[in-house]
C-alpha cells in the first residue's frame, strides 16, 4: 500500500496546530514542496526552510501566529481526493470555499495550483484539498 503524502502534510499541520506547536517537520517530496509553497504564498504559514538530516530532506514550516495572543491561527484543512476515491473537476465546476475566502488546491496538468490560478488558466484537475 502506498502512502498518501498530502494527507500526511495536512495531518501534521493540523496536529501541530492542536498541540500549539510553532513548527512542523514534513518529509520533503516534490508534491510536499509544491503544497507548502502554495500555503506560504497564500499566508497560511509564515516561513519554510529545507533541512537535511541523515541524508534525508525535511521541510520545517513555521505556523502563522496571532499578533496579540500566543496561539496560532486555526486553519481547517480537509483532504478531498484520496487514493481510494479520486475527485476531478473541470475549471467551471471548481468549488468556491467560503465564497472565495478559502482555497482549493488542485493537481493539474501544469502542476499543483490554487483554484484561482486554475480558473484564470482555464484548466481543471484533481481536487486535492480545501483550506480555510
Swiss-Prot record:
One of its GO terms (molecular function) is structural constituent of ribosome. Keywords: Chloroplast, Plastid, Ribonucleoprotein, Ribosomal protein, RNA-binding, rRNA-binding. One of its GO terms (cellular component) is chloroplast. Part of the 30S ribosomal subunit. Gene3D superfamilies: 3.30.1370.30, 3.30.1490.10. PANTHER family: 40S RIBOSOMAL PROTEIN S15A (PTHR11758). The gene is rps8. Belongs to the universal ribosomal protein uS8 family. It comes from the Eukaryota. Pfam families: Ribosomal_S8 (PF00410). One of the primary rRNA binding proteins, it binds directly to 16S rRNA central domain where it helps coordinate assembly of the platform of the 30S subunit. This is Small ribosomal subunit protein uS8c. It is found in: Plastid, Chloroplast. GO terms for biological process: translation.
Amino acid at each position: 500500500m502506498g502512502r498518501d503524502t498530502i494527507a500526511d502534510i495536512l495531518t501534521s499541520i493540523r496536529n501541530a496546530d492542536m498541540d500549539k506547536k510553532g513548527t512542523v517537520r514534513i518529509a520533503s517530496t516534490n508534491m510536499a514542496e509544491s503544497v507548502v509553497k502554495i500555503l506560504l504564498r497564500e499566508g497560511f504559514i509564515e516561513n519554510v526552510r529545507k533541512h537535511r538530516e541523515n541524508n534525508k530532506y525535511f521541510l520545517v514550516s513555521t505556523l502563522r501566529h496571532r499578533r496579540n495572543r500566543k496561539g496560532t491561527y486555526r486553519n481547517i484543512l480537509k483532504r478531498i481526493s484520496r487514493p481510494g476515491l479520486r475527485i476531478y473537476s473541470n475549471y467551471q465546476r471548481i468549488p468556491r470555499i467560503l465564497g472565495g475566502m478559502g482555497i482549493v488546491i488542485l493537481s493539474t496538468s501544469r502542476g499543483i495550483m490554487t483554484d484561482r490560478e486554475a480558473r484564470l488558466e482555464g484548466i481543471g484537475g484533481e481536487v486535492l484539498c480545501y483550506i480555510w
